Amino acid sequence: MKIQLKSKDEIEKLRYACQLAAEVLDMITEHVKAGVSTKYLDDLCFQHITEVQKATPANIGYRGYEKTICASINQVICHGIPSDDKILKDGDIMNIDVTVKKDGWHGDTSKMFLIGKSEPHNQRLVKVTQECLYLGINEVKPGARLGNIGAAIQSLSLIHISEPTRLAS
């Protein structure tokens, strides 16, 4: 699959939507701490997107999903559903995934958080995962194939982790 190139105008609209999504993660960072529910974080993100950014939380309504963010804790790899029952604890690893829709364009991003004091192996996991992300991003360029991104990530992850997670083709 070849990556489709966008016009300069399309890139600017896309970039703006992505900036809004990144801004949500910046805003929520100070609230991500032990004792907080993922539902509380979801509510804060909803309020910020709709009231401050005058945008739409793109996840809401997608295939019946009713939340603003995905909040994945520890062994939940992705798309965890925020809940009043999911309370962050010291030592947790959490990923928040947010998608903002503005003027028809989607900005989608996520951020990994270490809650409180984390074990060294958790810190290493987050560090290696981020390195893999940047290596994959480096593969994105005109004419590149999407498989190149996965191959780059896999090559680095195999150095650090004995069995990387693989998605079914």
Where is each model-derived feature located?
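Residues forming anionic-ligand binding surfaces in small-molecule and nucleic-acid pockets
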Residues: 22, 125-133
